[in-house]
Amino acid sequence: MAASSSEVSEMKGVEDSSNTHSEGPRHSEEGMGPVQVVAENLDQPEALQSGPDTTAAPVDSGPKAELAPETTETPVETPETVQATDLSVNPGEDSKTCPSPKEACQEPASRPEVNREATAEQGAEQQSAAPPEPTSEQALQLNTQSDPQPTSQPPPKPPLQAEPPTQENPTTEVLTESTGEKQENGAVVPLQAGDGEEGPAPQPHSPPSTKTPPANGAPPRVLQKLVEEDRIGRAHGGHPGSPRGSLSRHPSSQLAGPGVEGGEGTQKPRDYIILAILSCFCPMWPVNIVAFAYAVMSRNSLQQGDVDGAQRLGRVAKLLSIVALVGGVLIIIASCVINLGVYK
């Protein structure tokens, strides 16, 4: 019995050394698990009880020791090794202690998986939170620079040039030139006529003048209005140089005839002064004298350019001259008849 007890103590030492060497390969292979460890521990006491031959244990420790360098994981906690030694010492209690090594071995196996999942999730979060690559930003900037939107940045327009001021109406310039007027400080000043010839007459169509507007800055509409007012005043009151206005109350409706300057295709008022002189030889002296006066007035109006007044005065002179002539002839005939009949 003493020899058997010494052998048992030696076997325990060998088993302890073999267990420390076999911890690495036992935990590296997850499929092996604690079940195989328990089976090995149960087989070892049977070998001890069979005989004093102890060569089997060292043979098994060799491969286990060779597998130890291949393991990469750290050895498991010491309580597992303690439990394994307890199982080897007390093989009869394997039914009670088997559940605890399985749970202890399953926990370390599940922990690396949890750690791997946690690291994978952290890596995905870091990749999602990482900023985009600078190459993509540079590509976007190049695209935006190469294709600018026309609506966001329209091309600059050249500044509009100031339009030159509008020129005067050519008709107003023709009127001012024909009547001999001057423009001074935006006002129209008519000139005095040196001769007593007929007044304004329409000028033929002339090309548009290239004169610039007056330097005083008066608008062309004001100048045109002033010219029109001056023309209407002349038609009513005669030429500015005349001593008196015309007897006419309405503006002239007919222009001068071919004999008058500017008259084209219009009827010229006739001069009835000769008829008035003939009527003076008739015995209707008050009538023929008035007819002669109207004939002279009609001639003066025609010389001043008042065609309408000359026509009206000429018609009155004609009527009075005819009345004087007819009346004078009748008086002469009546006197002759009376004188000749009395003498017979």
Curated annotation (Swiss-Prot):
The modification Phosphoserine is found at residues 28, 242, 252-253. The modification Phosphothreonine is found at residues 74, 78. Keywords: Cell membrane, Cell projection, Cytoplasmic vesicle, Membrane, Methylation, Phosphoprotein, Postsynaptic cell membrane, Synapse, Transmembrane, Transmembrane helix. Residues 151-162, 201-211 have a biased composition (Pro residues). The keyword Cell inner membrane does not apply. Residues 343-344 are extracellular. Residues 273-293 dip into the membrane without crossing it. It is a single-pass membrane protein. Residues 69-82 have a biased composition (Low complexity). Coiled coil: none annotated. GO terms for biological process: negative regulation of short-term synaptic potentiation; negative regulation of SNARE complex assembly; neuromuscular process controlling posture; regulation of calcium-dependent activation of synaptic vesicle fusion; synaptic vesicle fusion to presynaptic active zone membrane. InterPro entries: CD225/Dispanin (IPR051423), CD225/Dispanin_fam (IPR007593). Residues 1-272, 294-321 are cytoplasmic. One of its GO terms (cellular component) is presynapse. The chain crosses the membrane at residues 322-342. Residues 124-143, 168-178 have a biased composition (Polar residues). It is found in: Cell membrane; Presynaptic cell membrane; Synapse; Cell projection, Axon. As a component of the outer core of AMPAR complex, may be involved in synaptic transmission in the central nervous system. In hippocampal neurons, in presynaptic terminals, plays an important role in the final steps of neurotransmitter release, possibly by regulating Ca(2+)-sensing. In the cerebellum, may inhibit SNARE complex formation and down-regulate short-term facilitation. Belongs to the CD225/Dispanin family. Component of the outer core of AMPAR complex. AMPAR complex consists of an inner core made of 4 pore-forming GluA/GRIA proteins (GRIA1, GRIA2, GRIA3 and GRIA4) and 4 major auxiliary subunits arranged in a twofold symmetry. One of the two pairs of distinct binding sites is occupied either by CNIH2, CNIH3 or CACNG2, CACNG3. The other harbors CACNG2, CACNG3, CACNG4, CACNG8 or GSG1L. This inner core of AMPAR complex is complemented by outer core constituents binding directly to the GluA/GRIA proteins at sites distinct from the interaction sites of the inner core constituents. This is Proline-rich transmembrane protein 2. It comes from Rattus norvegicus.
